[in-house]
Amino acid sequence: MLNKAMNIADYDPQLFKAIEDETRRQEEHIELIASENYTSPRVMEAQGSQLTNKYAEGYPGKRYYGGCEYVDVVETLAIERAKELFGATYANVQPHSGSQANSAVYMALLKPGDTVLGMNLAHGGHLTHGSPVNFSGKLYNIIPYGIDEAGKIDYVEMERLAVEHKPKMMIGGFSAFSGIVDWAKMREIADKIGAYLFVDMAHVAGLIAAGVYPNPVPHAHVVTSTTHKTLAGPRGGLILSAADDEDLYKKLNSAVFPGGQGGPLMHVIAGKAVAFKEALEPEFKTYQQQVVKNAKAMVEVFIERGYKIVSGGTDNHLMLVDLIGRDLTGKEADAALGSANITVNKNSVPNDPRSPFVTSGVRIGTPAITRRGFKEAEAKALTTWVCDILDDANNPAVIERVKGEVLALCAKYPVYA
């Protein structure tokens, strides 16, 4: 019999210390990585439940194991809430990650060797959109599109490439692009050549759910997302569609299970159900509106301080700071800011002369700081400190001063009060 009083602290102090150290790091560091966020205690409660014990291969009502009557309720709640949240007629909540959701779409719609039009990783795309080091770039013939000199998606060039190469699938979405994507224009191009339009909305799913960023679901044949990032749920994946195509839905379900996964993670699916319910609340829209306000406030300060922002601004939760021409690499900026308890990630920028391991850019996002309660005033003060360090990254006195400011602000705005 298992005793409910069992705990990690008494049994495994080494592991417990690592967990406690990470908890303290999150409380004492300002998180500016655009893909990170803080999930709610309700989501964590679901993930720590006895649902983790249950195998449930298959789908609600069609399982390969007995005893699934209650996990069927959990998964159905998640499915129906996801559909309501995004205006979809189909949802699959089983993918373990965004990358696995994307893999399932490739498997459902394509054959190895088929041509795919996807956003260049160096211009803001994602590994799974055709990077040569990823399965997508290894198994499929990838034609990359990118942004123009103004930092905007070049739809004229996209259409030219589509007409020339006739891809079977076009991919919309990004991991480092701060503008608005014209989903309707992409669908128009896809229809012109008879291609599928697949949108990976992982980065902006929360903004879309709240109505502060255009929804691709009415335009794309299929849409994927992560459930963390701006959605602020558990780490996981999601597939959606409003194509009203039962054959497509069956292909997508089969590509997830049994095509790419076995048993779903029912405790994570419960966490997704909670997060979708939270995202349907009015305060979630207020949160997402503030995410964008904070991002715009940060961009304003960066530009005032003489820093170049790719695309010239932001219309979502992120910005890409271009350090080309400065005596500072993305890797060095990442390390210097980290020393002051500000967490960012180095990132390639368009026409980057440096390797992806060094880079000439820094990607910054506002979902996590907004979740803590930061508004424009805090976002602007924080950006001033970031610029102070970028201006003088090798000055320990500047780093120590900023670290003190960061610790004081973190104490004022705890992640979990």
Swiss-Prot record:
GO terms for molecular function: glycine hydroxymethyltransferase activity; pyridoxal phosphate binding. InterPro entries: PyrdxlP-dep_Trfase, PyrdxlP-dep_Trfase_major, PyrdxlP-dep_Trfase_small, Ser_HO-MeTrfase, Ser_HO-MeTrfase-like, Ser_HO-MeTrfase_PLP_BS, SHMT-like_dom. It is an enzyme of class 2 (transferase). It comes from the Bacteria. Pathway: One-carbon metabolism; tetrahydrofolate interconversion; Amino-acid biosynthesis; glycine biosynthesis; glycine from L-serine: step 1/1. Its EC number is 2.1.2.1. One of its GO terms (cellular component) is cytosol. Belongs to the SHMT family. HAMAP family: SHMT. This is Serine hydroxymethyltransferase.
